Amino acid sequence: MAHKKAGGSTNNGRDSVSKRLGVKRFGGQVVLAGNILVRQRGTKFHPGTNVRKGKDDTLFATMDGRVVFSKKGKFMYQYISIEIT
């Protein structure tokens, strides 16, 4: 009797869709109010002047201008600001 036993199951075989996180507008780029600057989980980047933080920690511009990255404070946090041109 030619029988083949059932193959064992595997724990692999699935993958989640990427969330497309990261910096969307880089230093020196000109942006419009409402443009998304960074998509992030947590606050790797903190909002500086003319930048606000959304409920999912996304940083977005509140004014038209040029993107500026800087590090400030005791712990050298990274801030993103908009310099009005």
Swiss-Prot record:
The keyword Ribosomal protein applies. Keywords: Ribonucleoprotein, Ribosomal protein. It comes from the Bacteria. One of its GO terms (molecular function) is structural constituent of ribosome. GO terms for biological process: translation. PROSITE patterns: RIBOSOMAL_L27 (PS00831). PANTHER family: LARGE RIBOSOMAL SUBUNIT PROTEIN BL27M (PTHR15893:SF0), RIBOSOMAL PROTEIN L27 (PTHR15893). This is Large ribosomal subunit protein bL27. It comes from Vesicomyosocius okutanii subsp. Calyptogena okutanii (strain HA).
